[in-house]
Amino acid sequence: MTKKNAAPIPLILDLVDKLLEARFFTKLDIRWGYNNVRIHPDDIEKTAFKTPLGLFESLVMTFRLCNAPATFQTFMDTQFANIIATGHVVIYLDDILIFAETIRELTQLTHQVLQRIQDLDLFLRPAKCSFNQTSVEYLGLIISEGKICMDPIKLKAIQEWPLPQMVKDIQKFLGFCNFYHQFVKDYSHIAQPLFNLTKKGNPWNWTTKCNMAFETLRQTMIMSPVLMLLDHEKPFTLITDASDYATGMIIEQKDALG
């Protein structure tokens, strides 16, 4: 029986919140991901699988294992702990983001990370790495100085999204929207008719309200709203709202434009 690894995977927005004063970015992608972690010798025989060519065993951690994400995240957090502690490096599984206020500082940090990668005998995927950028795509978000946007490549999918015909279509659409929900004001309220369709036992009934919810979410995301990163030195305004089936809260700050 597998013992679940309870180590948490970082929340994407928690990582993004650390980027307030960053002006320059370098993104690195670790090649082969989970396969970089060796299986303990005592456990290798437990990985055996049968093929037409014979019986094989895995020497490295494979994908689709329930503990693979937590194990790999723990590995990365441990091996890069002192570099992460600088406050200028965040790691989400095999995606590393280095950020700084100056190119000089960014270059120094990048050298430290690359040296650690070399020491660990890890490799990068050059096609997915970018260096010394003022704007970078990271975990489905476009990050630049003081603000985050939705990835336009992913938004192209929402522009062409067909009208849902069954529950699975709704679940797929909501899965996409949930990832970007923080960009949509009153998201839970708007999406409620669609969530109702996914409840077990509810019949498929595509109503005018469902169609309006679908189009409102689609059009709001097509407009590609921008979120500003929180400045902890400025006052916060907390705005809350509630209905019979949803609660909402946003934190606002005034910028130079009010």
Specify the residue positions occupied by each region the protein language model found.
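Retroelement reverse transcriptase polymerase core
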Residues: 1-258
